[in-house]
């Protein structure tokens, strides 16, 4: 008998649907009262502790989710990914970001070729180059050391490296290595982003890293040309070769741009943009800032989770469990969003990065075979570090819509503070909230409890908390480069698990193309209107009205202006 075309047609899915009503009738207050259940929903790997006991799930739910994983052939799909099979079927590509952090002695193949030696050739080149820049043997055109780096990229070429950079900034080892250095990321084509990036920097001491696989990405290349002009207008055109390097596979265009092709760092088609932080995309700028040794620890941390994900049984597998629970929350309980709530300011850029990894990967409406999905898939991801988020959107999470939450805590702060006479230290104050919030969401507060506290009758409806709001708690021992790598890989693989179970292609992103193609038409119209005075034509009434209004209000912009750079 042929396998069902959609996971929702399997008996395992239907069994979970039937099981759902009983779970909906059971409050988390009752579920949390079962100590044996709670113990069964705790897991530890390499001193990372996961507690998922505050999920709206029983041990029977978890067993049924494992059966769903089997029905989706989850283990086989994971193996296919690690074996280099072309699981990105719409682009006919392998998906091998795990190879980017593999040790030298490991063999991971794509199309019959072990790609790990190629990866390490690039890593060795990055180490050599970043060492030379950091020790002053590679200098700028005027003989000054290059202490400042601007990485130019967008999407996956920006969000992942920015997350890691922000997390490392306050790590003691990394911050010591970065002393006297500056790393900035230029992503938005908005000239304000250019102005902010070059503000306070001198072209003489700045190295620009242009990140574009094809070297044709519109926003990135316009920003790259802008910084090229910033450098060449101050130092002369020949300075570009000393002040700009590339992460790209298109060597002819790199050379045409004015960058020495020897200073181009490769990556491959089997690396998706949102999974590219462990490639030269992230490793080069991060190594320039923190030194290769620190970044290598980050890669080792990611690899440790890669091994765990590929080898641990499902019941002891952190990414698998998190992925299955997300499927449960989205497709069965009907919760469309997830809040990522790290109780560490160093992780302030985690949620924006995972937002892209998750929503670009799993924001699909059809199966990998092109069939419309008859169930909800994908999550709306957002988040903010605690306790900032508590004074922002937690109100809605507690008393509005139900939004499953990921609470991420760190046992030892990167930068501990102790004040004599305080009841608790600063990190304990932070962690008090980390431990309290999941219980507040799970248990809530009943009208009966409020009456016992003599709360006024008219305020009881306003002060009632329904509870029964699911969350997971992930506790990391520290937040160094190794643990940051682990955290990244946990979320990357969790997203893959969701896609594998839903039966979608988590590794393409056709949804970003339509807007880009329409922008090409608008770009052509703006040029024609400014240079030739052409009327706005070929658009619907709304767009025509907006475009005309914009052109009229900017009629003072010259058709062929002289170069003007930000002045800030």
From Swiss-Prot:
Catalytic center residues: 360, 391, 516
Single GO biological process annotation from the record: glycolytic process
Location(s), subcellular: Cytoplasm
GO molecular-function terms, A-Z: carbohydrate derivative binding; glucose-6-phosphate isomerase activity; monosaccharide binding
EC number(s) from the headed UniProt entry: 5.3.1.9
Catalytic activity: alpha-D-glucose 6-phosphate = beta-D-fructose 6-phosphate
InterPro entries from the UniProt entry: G6P_Isomerase (IPR001672), G6P_Isomerase_C (IPR023096), Phosphoglucose_isomerase_CS (IPR018189), SIS_dom_sf (IPR046348), SIS_PGI_1 (IPR035476), SIS_PGI_2 (IPR035482)
Keywords, comma-separated and alphabetical: Cytoplasm, Gluconeogenesis, Glycolysis, Isomerase
Pfam families to which the protein is assigned, alphabetical: PGI
Pathway(s) of this molecule: Carbohydrate degradation; glycolysis; D-glyceraldehyde 3-phosphate and glycerone phosphate from D-glucose: step 2/4
GO cellular component: cytosol
PANTHER family (alphabetical): GLUCOSE-6-PHOSPHATE ISOMERASE
Family indicated by similarity: Belongs to the GPI family.
The protein's assembly and partners: Homodimer.
Protein's UniProt name: Glucose-6-phosphate isomerase, cytosolic 1
Organism of provenance: Clarkia williamsonii
Lineage: Eukaryota, Viridiplantae, Streptophyta, Embryophyta, Tracheophyta
């Amino acid at each position: 008998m042929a396998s069902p075309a959609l996971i929702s047609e399997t008996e395992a899915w239907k069994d979970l649907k039937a099981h759902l009503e009983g779970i909906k009738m059971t409050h988390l207050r009752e579920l949390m009262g079962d100590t044996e259940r709670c113990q069964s929903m705790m897991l530890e790997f390499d001193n990372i502790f996961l507690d998922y006991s505050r999920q709206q799930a029983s041990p029977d739910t978890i067993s049924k989710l494992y059966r769903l994983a089997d029905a989706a052939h989850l283990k086989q799909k994971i193996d296919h990914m690690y074996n280099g099979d072309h699981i990105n079927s719409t682009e006919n590509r392998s998906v091998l970001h795990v190879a980017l952090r593999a040790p030298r002695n490991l063999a991971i193949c794509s199309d019959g070729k072990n790609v790990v030696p190629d990866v390490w050739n690039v890593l060795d080149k990055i180490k050599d180059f970043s060492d030379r820049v950091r020790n002053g043997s590679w200098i700028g055109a005027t003989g000054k050391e290059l202490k400042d780096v601007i990485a130019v990229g967008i999407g996956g070429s920006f969000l992942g490296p920015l997350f890691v950079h922000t997390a490392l900034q306050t790590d003691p080892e990394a911050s010591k290595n970065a002393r006297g250095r500056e790393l900035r990321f230029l992503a938005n084509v908005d000239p304000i982003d250019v102005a902010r990036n070059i503000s306070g920097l001198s072209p003489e001491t700045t190295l620009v890293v242009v990140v574009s696989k094809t070297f044709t990405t519109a926003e990135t290349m316009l920003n790259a040309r802008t910084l090229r002009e910033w450098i060449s207008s101050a130092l002369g055109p020949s300075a570009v070769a000393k002040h700009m390097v590339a992460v790209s596979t298109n060597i002819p265009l790199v050379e045409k741009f004015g960058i020495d092709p020897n200073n181009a760092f490769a990556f491959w088609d089997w690396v998706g943009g949102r999974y590219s932080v462990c490639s030269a995309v992230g490793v080069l700028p991060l190594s320039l800032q923190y030194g290769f040794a620190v970044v290598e620890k980050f890669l080792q941390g990611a690899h440790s989770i890669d091994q765990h994900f590929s080898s641990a049984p499902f019941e002891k597998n952190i990414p698998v469990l998190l992925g299955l629970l997300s499927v449960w929350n989205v497709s069965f309980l009907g919760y469309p969003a997830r809040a990522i709530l790290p109780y560490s300011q160093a992780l302030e850029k985690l949620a924006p990065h995972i937002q892209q990894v998750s929503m670009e990967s799993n924001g699909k409406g059809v199966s990998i075979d092109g069939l419309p999905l008859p169930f909800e898939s994908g999550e709306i991801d957002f988040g903010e570090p605690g306790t900032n988020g508590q004074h922002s959107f937690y109100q809605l999470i507690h008393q509005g819509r139900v939004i499953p939450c990921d609470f991420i805590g760190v046992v030892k702060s990167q930068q501990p503070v102790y004040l004599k006479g305080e009841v608790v230290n600063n990190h304990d104050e932070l962690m008090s909230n980390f431990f309290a919030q999941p219980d507040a969401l799970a248990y809530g507060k009943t009208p009966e409890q409020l009456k016992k506290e003599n709360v006024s009758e008219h305020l009881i409806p306003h002060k009632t908390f329904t509870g029964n709001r699911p969350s997971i708690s992930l506790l990391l021992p520290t937040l160094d480069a190794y643990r940051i790598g682990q955290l990244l890989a946990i979320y990357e693989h969790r997203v893959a698990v969701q896609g594998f179970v839903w039966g979608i292609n988590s590794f393409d992103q056709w949804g970003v193309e339509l807007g880009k193609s329409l922008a090409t038409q608008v770009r052509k119209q703006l040029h024609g209107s400014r240079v030739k005075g052409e009327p706005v034509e070929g658009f619907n009434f709304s767009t025509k009205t907006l475009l005309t209004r914009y052109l009229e209000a900017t009629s003072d912009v010259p058709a062929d202006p002289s170069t003007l750079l930000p002045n800030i």
